[in-house]
C-alpha cells in the first residue's frame, strides 16, 4: 500500500491517494511516512481541516530534510484561510493565518530564527482580512512591513508582487509602478516575473496564459537547485 500511495502522490492523483492513504494509515497509524503522504493527499484534494487533523496525530522524528510535515501544515492552513476569504468569513481567515505561525513540535522540525522566516504572504492575506473588516490601521501596518521588505537581487521571487501591491494599497502608486517597470526590463524571460506584471496590471487573461505555459514546462534549472518559489502556487490560486 505504501508504494501504491507513493505512486498516486507522485503522479498527483489525489483522489486515489486519499483512498489508499486512508486504508494504509488505518493499518499503520504509527508510520509517519504514510501519515505525511495521506495528509498531503488530503490537503491537495481540498480537505484542509482533515489534513490538519491527520498531522496533529503524527509523531515525526526529526531528521535532515524533515521540513515536509511543516510544509503540508502551512499549506493546509493557508488554503483553508483562502477558503474562508472566498466565503467572507474574515475572522476565521485570520485565525487560520495565525495558525501558520505555529511550528508544531510533533512534525519534526523546529522553528528557525525569526529573520529567516518569510511571512509576507501571510501578512498580506491578514492585511486584506483587516481591510474587509474595516480595520485600516492594522491593515496599513502590515502593508508597510511588506512594502519595506527586501527583494532578492539573486533571483525573482513571486513575493515581489506582494511588495508592489502593498505599496499600491498604501497609496504609493508611483513607487510601485516604477518597480514593475524595472521588472519589465530586468526579467524579460522570467515567466513568474511576467505573470506578476500582468497580475499587477489586472491583465487576467494574459496572466492565465502565462501561468498555463509555466505549469506545462515547470522545472528547476540546474543552477537554481537551492531555490524554489514556494509561494507562487498560493499566489496563482488567488
Give the predicted meaning of each segment.
Residues 3-12, 190-198:
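Alpha-helical segment of the N-proximal tetratricopeptide repeat
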Residues 15-25, 49-62, 89-102, 136-147, ...:
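Alpha-helical repeat scaffolds
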